[in-house]
Every structure is written in structure tokens, then in C-alpha cells.
Amino acid sequence: MVDRWYNIAADLPGVLAPPKDPDEGESRIALLTRILPSALIDQEFTAERWVPIPEEVREVYRRVGRPTPLLRAEGFERALGTKVHIYYKYEGVLPVGSHKLNTAVAQAYYAKADGAVEVATETGAGQWGMAVSLAAALFGLKATVFMTRSSYNSKRQRLVFMRAYGATVYPSPSEVTETGRRHFRPDHPGSLGIAISEAVEYVLSGERRKYLPGSVMEFVLLHQTVIGLEAMRQLPEEPDYAVACVGGGSNFGGFTYPMLGAKLRGEGFGKTKFLAVESAAAPKLTRGEYRYDFPDATGILPLIKMYTLGHDYVPPPVHAAGLRYHGAAPSLSLLKRLGHVEAVAYGQEEVMEAALLFARSEGVLPAPESAHAVRAVIYLAKKLPPGSVVVFNMSGHGLLDVDAYEKALEWEKIYKHPED
């Protein structure tokens, strides 16, 4: 069992631009101390390479099934007719079906330690909302979740799970907050940016509440490094490529940062390249601008320097709702800017076709978000020479994404198999 998280800040090849306040209005940086547990603020700005995992958090990790397995996708290799070795780290075995529980448990623990009685958050497809709902229940906290309206209407199974864990869930934009009322209309699909603003506003409107972010913040990526640290111990051979999907960056950072950090220090993984895969509906790394922007739609939180499509950008509804975010974590953005991370974007039709191929050859139904990595692996398997090694993070299963697979089966009548 991993006993410490890895912090990429200690090994970054450039200076990570700090958060800053806008020119007008109250200090957003000071606001962080009101909405976040104090330990998380310390972790956000620390330059220490290793951060000890509290024993209480490690115990929950054990109970929910860590370490998760790393598997050879031999059936997928045969289906592709490739001699490339393909491995995947499978986070879908966790109770909520995704990697999101890794940081939800840590954040709920720190919120409880700070005296909170309730936590609030945003969620897209519902994986993060499920994780916070369960983590809150495990630590005796109330949970309130603002779920993007398009997913609230289409991902009903995850909505049921959140409520089963004891959470209160609102469709966002909602009529609960001023932010929600400003954007509200029944057919508005919502966005993670709006949902973040609603969750923060909700926390500020009550007592003993804390906000738990699902991505973008550096401490979220820190907690997720349990994935990559485990994978480094489990891999039988050094990969040529490490691949993961990107919404805000926690999945990609959690999986790749331990390997990338070792490469930057000259301690292994010298040949490994790192590929971030995003949705064509929210292509911040491939089409966004590298600049300061708000991580939320309303501008409640501090400005951070990142690749962004603009905080007012509302991505079109797609099945991979967890990737419908306008920006990427500052550390990931810097690494992409400096050329240490590659990026590619795919449309959902070719992604879901790849997901079906993986399901039929491996028996694992990928979450639509994770399927973006599967699509990229197909490309790499055709591009790389025989004997090359590719590893990717299967960040979650798609057993609660029936709507996405129903549509994929319709698309299959048109599309055969993903092409280069």
C-alpha cells in the first residue's frame, strides 16, 4: 500500500505561476481559506516532493480496494492485430466505479478534521458526485452536489447512487443559488464552471461547510498519484507511452505524474512519452489559450494560469460529461506548454466505437471519459513498432452509462472501427 502522495511541483522544469486576484473586487485568494480545509491549502502550495498519507485515509483506501489492478489487454491486442504490448490500470473496481474516490476520501477526511459538518461540490457525469457522497458518508458528513443539468437528466443511475449514499443533489443551473438563478432556464445543459460557482456560493452561505473540488486544484492531482505510484510498482516493462484522458487534469496527473517526475529527475522512464486525451467538445489543451482565467464560470475563485477555452465557455452536451470543462490544471498546462506532455482530442462517435471494441475483446465496459484513452491507444498501436509498450489509465467503468452505449450501438451501424 502506498503511504505517501507525489507532488510534481518539486520537479517541474519551469516556474508554476501562482494564483492571483482579479484587478477589481474582493480577494479570491483569501476566499480559499473560508471554503477549503486548511490542510488542502497547505498541500496546494507546498513544494515538498512527498506528502504523507494519513493512516485514516490509508485505511479507507484498503477498505475500498486499493491497490487497484494493472492488467495486460491481450484480447484487445489480438482484436487490433498489434504486436504492441498494451496494459491498463483499472480504477473501475472501486465502489463508485472510478478514480474519483482517491481524492474524495482525502478531502472529506481533512474537512472533518477542520470541524465541518457538510461538504458541497460540483459534478459532471456524476463520478465525482458519487465519490464525494460516499466519502462524506464514511466520515459522517452531509453532502450537497450540484450536477450539470444535461447529466442530471441523462445519468439518472448515478443520481440514484448519490442519493443512496445520503447526498442532496441539485441540477445545475439551479434555483438554489444566485449563480444558478442567473443562468437558469429549463433547457440549459449546465457546465462544470457554473456548477463550481454554485457549490462555492452554497458553502459561503452557511456555517461549517467546506467545498471539495473534483479536479484542477494541485492537491487533487496530488491525491490521485496513488494511481501512478501503484502502476510503477506493477508494470513489468517500461512504457513507451503513458496515456490518460483529461477533463481538468486529476486523472491524467494522478496516473502520469509519478512516472513523469521520475523522468524529470533522471530516475527512470527516460523513453516514456505522455499523451493527454481530451474531448473535441472541450479541447483546451489542443485549441485553448495559455493564460490566466477563472476556474469557475462566475469568477468567484482566484485566477489561475492554464490552458483555457474561457470560463464562460459552455461545452455542448456529450456522453463524456466529466471532460466538459474549459480549463486544465496549472501544472499540466505548464508541462504541455514546455513540451513534456502531448495532447490530442477526439469526437465522441469514434471514442464510443473504440469503447465497444475494448468491451468485446476485454469484457470491460469503459466509461465514456476513459474511452478517450482507449481511442488514443488504438492509434498508438498502429503507429508504434512491434514490441513497444503502451499503458493507460482506465479511470472508470461505463456500467452506469447505458445512454451512451445505446447511442454507440446506433452509431455502429454507420462506423465500422476507429481509423487513424
Curated annotation (Swiss-Prot):
It comes from the Archaea. Keywords: Amino-acid biosynthesis, Aromatic amino acid biosynthesis, Lyase, Pyridoxal phosphate, Tryptophan biosynthesis. Its EC number is 4.2.1.20. One of its GO terms (cellular component) is cytoplasm. Pfam families: PALP. InterPro entries: Trp_synth_b-like, Trp_synth_b_CS, Trp_synth_beta/beta-like, TrpB-like_PALP, TrpB-like_PALP_sf. The beta subunit is responsible for the synthesis of L-tryptophan from indole and L-serine. This is Tryptophan synthase beta chain. It comes from Pyrobaculum islandicum (strain DSM 4184 / JCM 9189 / GEO3).
